[in-house]
Amino acid sequence: MGKIRNINYINQIGIKKVLCHTNMGNTIYILNNGQKYKEFSEDYRDLSDSINREFQESLLQQTDEYGHSIISYPEIVISSKKELFGIVGTFEQGTPLLEIDPLIQIDYLLNLIDRLEEGIKDISLKGWNLEDLHEENILINPISKTSPIRIIDTDYHVLQLQKDRLELYRTNMKRIFSAIITSIIPSICKSNILKDKDVEQQYVLASNGVIKVSDFLRYLLFKIKISTKEPLTIKTLQKSI
């Protein structure tokens, strides 16, 4: 299970540049082969610590999902018998969902959300709890034909095979709902549109992961009946709420 290499793997490939430092004290590098290497801070290193050993085990389980259609899981864990150094995976490019271009057309956005929801369903049925999933960990890349939407920073995704799959699915869908609504229509909670009982009911169902956020957005578009000769964009929707 999982792929593990020692630190010589990084030394042999070589580091091209430092990409950034995270607020958790980790450092992100781009390697000479184009991959991303996340080097963990000292807090994660010591494998005599049971919490760090569990963290490494979870990361190794994630490598079994490398190549997932939506989620950018690591390919390799860099470790020794005593130390956990970091993880290597694909360097994903794109714009965080929170900073999505408001001129993107709604039809395109809904297509992306459909793909995202299918990926969430797939990974939830396998028993994954996608902790720390939020609007800054979802990347949009309209230029890419193969990976226009990706979930990154999966360190705290946890495989929970003992959990009910429907419960996991709804938990993960609640996170997706929060990320999308926060990014696309953050003002909806203050809007008069939720005074419509039918809209409010659909909103509550979607916010609890009972129905898909894409279905809620399509229902919302149906209810507000936006009239425009131009392609409908996120900005148009925001102004109509």
Which residues are covered by each model-predicted region?
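A short, low-complexity linker immediately N-terminal to eukaryotic Hanks-type protein kinase catalytic domains
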Residues: M1-K16
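Amphipathic alpha-helical segments that line or abut small-molecule/effector binding pockets
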Residues: I106-L125
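Catalytic-loop of the protein kinase fold
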Residues: I120-P142
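ATP-binding glycine-rich loop module of kinase domains
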Residues: Q12-Y73, V77, I100-P102
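Conserved structural core of kinase catalytic domains
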Residues: S69-L112
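Hydrophobic transmembrane helix bundles of membrane-integrated enzymes that assemble
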Residues: Y29, R115-L116, I138, P148, ...
